[in-house]
């Protein structure tokens, strides 16, 4: 598995929340601005979100990416639809890119 880079879409409303888990019911860790560069470490399936990107394409996905902004960042989950990774994160990282698989490898 390899990490993947991304950027928060520049037309997101204000700040995008990072959370402790893959859904809006999880506590907010912090909020990041549009245009923020990110590294996607893995993804999990969770609550479905919908967002229309600057090109006018509406994306709906239940993927939530575990993202960091630097090596010192503890990270958190952000709905994949708010992040421009250049494609579908589940295809880019594959089955081995799920956070569950990553946790198993780290144990």
Residue ranges of predicted features:
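SH3-family beta-barrel domains
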Residues: 1-37, 42-44, 89-107
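Short, Lys/Arg- and Gly-enriched loop/turn segments at beta-strand edges
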Residues: 45-57
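Solvent-exposed loop/turn segments at secondary-structure junctions
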Residues: 24, 38-39, 45-48, 71-74, ...
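Boundary regions of SH3-family modules and the immediately adjacent low-complexity/disordered segments
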Residues: 1-3, 54-107
């Amino acid at each position: 598995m390899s990490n993947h880079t991304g950027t928060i879409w520049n037309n997101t409303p204000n700040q995008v929340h990072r959370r402790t888990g893959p859904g809006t019911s999880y506590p907010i860790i912090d909020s990041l601005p549009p245009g923020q560069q990110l590294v996607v470490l893995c993804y999990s399936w969770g609550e479905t979100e919908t967002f229309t990107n600057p090109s006018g394409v509406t994306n709906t996905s239940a993927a939530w990416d575990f993202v960091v902004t630097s090596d010192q960042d503890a990270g958190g989950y952000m709905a994949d639809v708010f992040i421009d990774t250049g494609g579908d994160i589940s295809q880019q990282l594959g089955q081995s890119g799920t956070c569950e698989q990553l946790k198993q490898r780290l144990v």
